Structures are given as C-alpha cells and as structure tokens.
C-alpha cells in the first residue's frame, strides 16, 4: 500500500500567523527520512487558505518524493500548474467550494470544463487522477477520458466509522445527521459504505484504473480498508498532523505507516 502524506495543515498553522514557521520543507524531509512515505500530497486551493503558489514551486524544485497536487478546475490554477518547469508527479482534480471547511464529496463529472482540464494536464505529460465518489458512472467517465488513476472519497465511510467506534458523536463538531442514528443503523450504513468502496475498487481494477482513496481517514478507521485488495494508495493528512502536534511528526508518520504497510 502506498502512503501519501498530505501536509496542508503544516501550512495551515503557518498561515494562521502569516509567519515563516512551521517550515514546509522541514516537514517534507522528516517524511522522507522515515522511509515510509511514498508521496507528498498538497491541495492548492483557489482561496489559498493554506498552500501558496510559492510552496508549490519550492516543493517541486527540491522534493525527493513525488508530489501529488490536488486542485479544482479553476483556469488560473490549471494554467499555473501546466506552465511549471518542474512538473508534479500527478494532479488530482477535486471539487471545491470556497465556503467548505474541507472537501465535501467527489467530483460532479458533468462539471463544465472538466474534460478540457483533464486534457490540458495530459497534453503536458502530467498524470491525472480524479477525486470521485465510489460510483460506476464516475468510473466510466474516468475511463472515457483516459484517466489512469482515481481517488475514492472515503468521507462517508470515515464519518460512519468515527460515529460508531469513537466519541465523535459527543464532540463539539459532531455531525448532526449521524447523532440521530442508532448504533444498528450506523453499523448497517458503514457496512454498505465499505462494500461500495470494495465493489467499485474491483471494477476500477478490471478497467485498468489504479485505485487510491482518501478523506477523513485516521488511525482507527484506516485498517478496514486494507481488506480491499485492489486499493493501491491512501492519502492521509489531518489525522497525522493532529497527532504530530502531540507526539511529533516523525512518530505520527511511523505509527500510521505501521498500520497501512503490513
């Protein structure tokens, strides 16, 4: 299993104070020196709430690890990434809403301009991945546009798992809709969410599409996904950076790697 470490929230902490620390390159090399991280993931958002263009340039210039850049189909971002001398190893196209706290679901594949954006990156020799819900129509869209990788949105699975097996439902930011469900309902919906991820991962595999997954994954809910044989890559960020605040980045990475690289 490939481990993609999302380091957006290293930069979130920097941007809160508009200062120079923590240094994103230091985080990069801590990750590299664990020998457990396979790629670095960053999200270049339209509102630049964390990662900035300058961060992209610095990372691509010196990173010993492949860089996966998540972004919307915004034309300015597409033009910027396509113009780079040092190219990312892949671009993952994600939906984006300026009012969201984090990405809320997979891409709407009927989105105007999506096909053109995919082609723009492909014409520059940049691998494209689509961040999609585990749905058959989305997979067929990927295949029709010669997309060789997809990343399944695991938010539904992760939220259900957290509601059932952690104290998430008792926290200040608990999801209201999940608080109203019984443990039996949560368990059934979680089982169905897992089965859907497994089914669509298998279908993607037979289409010749590499399957990645991410969103909301943490030290508790990630283990079940290892039972999906066609799943090749997990992109995880917030939970690792959250633990790093308490135990240090190296230890947080190693603990996650121990779970997913068995």
From Swiss-Prot:
InterPro entries the UniProt entry points to: Aldolase_TIM (IPR013785), PyrdxlP_synth_PdxJ (IPR004569), Pyridoxine-5'_phos_synth (IPR036130)
Protein name per Swiss-Prot or TrEMBL: Pyridoxine 5'-phosphate synthase
GO BP annotations, alphabetical order: pyridoxine biosynthetic process
Single Gene Ontology MF annotation: pyridoxine 5'-phosphate synthase activity
Highest taxon in the source lineage: Bacteria
Residues forming the catalytic site: 43 (proton acceptor), 70 (proton acceptor), 215 (proton donor)
Family annotation (PANTHER family): PYRIDOXINE 5'-PHOSPHATE SYNTHASE
